[in-house]
Regions:
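Bacterial N-terminal signal peptides that target proteins for export
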Residues: 6-18
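Subset-of-secretome marker
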Residues: 32-182
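C-terminal motif of bacterial Sec signal peptides marking the signal peptidase cleavage site
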Residues: 27-30
Length: 182
């Protein structure tokens, strides 16, 4: 009887190892898929927070708090705003309300972002995520209109149209024209 029990014990161990091995394989596969999904989700949320101000997924994926998420979005908006102001040599230091309008313009521009985030894939010991962000080409798209506006504005300056304007009013008028075009 003892011999009979040993044979069944060996068979039982072999059969019990099969489900354990299968469980291990399935759990590792699920973990890998889960890790890949987390990386893809994180990248999507990072783009969405920077361009769209969508904080919910970013907070969940990164562990950041609402204040940090809002600050990240605002920093990106400030960067685009500053780039636009620098590109067009606009000085609005004395007109803070114009800064708000340029920030609103930056938010509007970024709201049109078009991007694609592919699934994450493992390459050796690292995960890679392919991201395609389609360019907005704001400056190229509006170049002819802005050039015509600047030429007209400069001709009006030469004609003395703005001689009675303060520097702040002059810069505000010029800035508003750019915002209307962009």
């Amino acid at each position: 009887m003892n011999f009979f029990m040993k044979i069944h014990a060996k068979k039982y161990k072999r059969f019990s190892l099969l489900p354990i091995c299968m469980l291990l394989i399935f759990s590792l596969t699920a973990c890998t898929a889960n890790v890949e999904k987390r990386y893809q989700t994180y990248i999507k949320s990072l783009i969405a927070i920077n361009y769209l101000g969508a904080t919910k997924d970013y907070i969940a994926a990164s562990g950041a708090n609402q204040e940090d998420a809002d600050a990240l979005y605002q920093a990106n908006i400030d960067l685009l705003t500053d780039n636009i102001l620098t590109y067009y040599s606009v000085n609005i230091d004395d007109a803070p309300e114009m800064r708000e309008q340029f920030e609103s313009l930056a938010k509007n521009i970024y709201s049109k972002v078009n991007y694609k985030v592919d699934k994450a894939r493992k390459d050796g010991s690292v995960y890679l995520v392919d991201v395609t962000i389609y360019p907005i080409n704001l400056f190229a798209q509006t170049s002819s209109e802005v050039t015509a506006y600047v030429d007209t504005f400069n001709n009006d300056v030469k004609a003395g149209t703005y001689n009675d304007y303060s520097l702040t009013d002059y810069e505000t008028l010029f800035s508003q024209g750019l915002i209307d075009i962009l």
